[in-house]
Amino acid sequence: MKEINPDIIFNLAAESQVLRSADNPLDTYKSNIFGSLNLFDSIRKLQINPKIIHASTDKVYGISDNLPYREDHKLYSNFTYDISKISADLIAQNYKEIYGLDITLFRSCNIYGPADFNYDRLIPHIVKSFIRKKPPIFRSNGKYLREYIYVEDLIEYIIMLTRNRGEEYIFNLGSGVITLLADLST
């Protein structure tokens, strides 16, 4: 990394599947916590100063009907995936504040778009259900509120974050449209 001396690093790597995280907590913690920690500490030791864009999730705020979330909303959850992302976020903040790394952290809502064939995720599952002319199955009663963002819109926002030079460094990225899950299937 020192030879390349990158201007920007996008830390997008993570175990992102909530169900798989629940089944494999150790692997999730290794990937999501130690993956980020290894990246940040390598940059610190190499004494390079790239802009780091660190990806997170609105799952760090837990489950709430108080949407959309604000960046100063309390971080809390009991779920493996969420805890792994909370931990990585706190480590990112630590390396920014204590070691001076140039980190901008974003927390996105649920992402949807083309080429998402993970049918454990709600939008691909609903599309597959429509194609098969079967009703979608919700893991909940469909009464949860969620915010969604189209993948290309998220990419535009992430690119804008590379130009962030202000004091604020934590951003929630979403569409601003809150949807009842059951409404997605109508």
Residue spans for each PLM region:
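Short aromatic/basic micro-patch
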Residues: 105, 148, 178
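Aromatic/hydrophobic pocket-lining residues that form π-stacking "cages" and hydrophobic walls in ligand
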Residues: 39, 92, 125-126, 185
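Glycine/proline-rich active-site loop of Rossmann-fold NAD(P)-dependent oxidoreductases
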Residues: 86, 112-125, 134, 139, ...
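Hydrophobic "lid"/C-terminal helical patch
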Residues: 130, 158-162, 185
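Conserved catalytic core of two-component sensor histidine kinases
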Residues: 155
